[in-house]
Amino acid sequence: MRKLGLALSIMGLLLVSIVAGCIGGGTETKTEAKKVKVAILFDVGGRGDLSFNDMAYLGAERAKKELGVEIEYMTPKSKEDMKPLLEQLAQSKEYDLLVLVGFLWTSPLNEVADKYPDQKFALIDSTTGKVRENEVDILFREQEAAALMGVIASGMAYELGGDTIGAVAGMDIPPLWKFHIGYLFGAKYFEKKTGKPVKLLWQYTGTFGDTQVGYNTAMQLLQQGAKVLYGLAGLTHVGMFDAVKDWNEQGRGKALAMGQDASQEWYAPKYIPISGAKRVDVAVYDAIKMVVDGTWKGGIITLGLKENGVGYWDLDGVKQFAEFAKEAGKLKDMTPDEVVQIVKEQREKYIKPYVWDIVHELEEKIKSGEIVFKTPKTHEEYEQIIRELEKGNLNAALEKGSVE
């Protein structure tokens, strides 16, 4: 779920932004050790998306600073350029690791990886479905973040005088099934802990790229009584943000929104007090660290709360993305510090201490492994879990553990 920006190109294929930092001032020494060299291959659109690509940049910059690696950033001109670019880089044998950001790299990687067994690849937020020694796929346990967001949304709904929460979701695909299960689980967990009933209105839009559809869907959910809407549709849910803003400013009622993946509070901090986090930056850093440490092992890795791979954004994260928005010319009426102050005030107003207590309790159960969420393998299994959760059967969503 991400918003695509303008793609830039050099040599007809890519934009290469070489981050120096690998050469200090002064004369080179003869004994200088060879640095690990990494290429970060952004999704189409590159930097400035205020989402996946910018988070990948954060993770790579952290690796450069903490691990001393050399980083190059590259953006394909289009989807058609992805495979040629990937093949070109693998052929060059210049890079210890190629990090591929986003699901659009899945098919190109499947076509290229077997040809270059000595080239290491890391695919972020997708999987080729094949286990290779030279490939690591890093996925996220979305249920864990969504469960916390379900608790938070439920608490905010009651502060707004209602008992209904909603979600504007993208396409009916497995990652969204996990979000749905987690979000509903969190709402029912809140219900069980407080005795306050919570109703969830979940709506698939069928798109990740249509703001008008997001706006219209959000308005329908607000008209049905939703007090808090969770955006799970990429660019589409930016329209949801606009709808919530209009709903409040037109005097039609009080409502709040929650973002997802990157910190999105900067977009309308008065109405978006919190965002769920999918830490692409952590995934990128971890992949690079495996190469540096010599702990590389091909296969699929999942990141959740325990690994700091998912969760919700703290105020430092809010400020970081507000600064990105400012750099991109999208934060025009306030400073990043003002965004943080507004968000802090809104969180204090709408997310009460008892709600944070429930969030932290659930968070600890997940981190410790006391409870583990199921990952549905079929749509039928997904639907069955949702039906059971709606009845209040929280254990239907769990692979391990139970909620009494």
Curated annotation (Swiss-Prot):
A Pfam family that the UniProt record links to this protein: Bmp
Record-level GO cellular component terms: plasma membrane
N-acetylcysteine carried by residues: C22
Organism encoding this protein: Pyrococcus abyssi (strain GE5 / Orsay)
Chain ranges passing through the membrane: none
Keyword vocabulary terms for this entry: Acetylation, Cell membrane, Lipoprotein, Membrane, Signal
Protein name: Uncharacterized lipoprotein PYRAB04520
Keyword Acetylation on entry: yes
Keyword Hydrolase: no
Signal sequence interval, chain numbering: 1-21
